[in-house]
Amino acid sequence: MDAGKLRRGDRLAPIADSCRRLHAGRRFLHDFDMFEIQPRYLAIVLERGFRLPARYEEFEPQIRELERAMRVHPEPTVPCNNDLLAENFIDVGGEMRLIDYEYSGNNEPSFELGNVWSESNLSPEQLEELVAHYYGSPLRNKVARARLWGLMSKYGWTLWGSIQDGISDLDFDFWGWAMEKYERAVEELDGPEFRRLLSDVQRED
């Protein structure tokens, strides 16, 4: 699978099904929480003197506000892949299979949906459809939760890219990869919908 095919929209129901199958399985040994991972990555970047995007730390108060809003009605954690770029879905006769469990751990289901949305640049309407396939209807608080997890994912993985840019010998533009994530995160943090999403995620639908 690739992001272009995923954006066509006809694979959203099978993707939701594949996530539900994984989430119904046995729990992993470890948890995965981007609100805990991102500060650790930031500490490494600052300690080692790696490159940090302009204004990155300026958004930290908003990120902590985001975390507080998300903690109001946390979802029960389930076994998650946590790295749902399109290439980690394999279409087997119309059924989507998941591969690459390097970052697997127990996490909220909505993180997975937000990760799918973010990694493949789906539209907000496609995220609503994905949420509806997973939960049975496009609940406002779940849509907001998935979108905010997608935002937090981009903000956190930016630092992973910065670290790799500083230490990796691979012939890959990790900084460019990180900046693509970061610029999209900034667009959302500076955007007009951020406050509404913080409100929606605290609803009880």
What do the predicted segments below correspond to?
Residues 34-71, 125, 180-186:
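Active-site catalytic-loop/activation-segment of kinase and kinase-like phosphoryl-transfer enzymes
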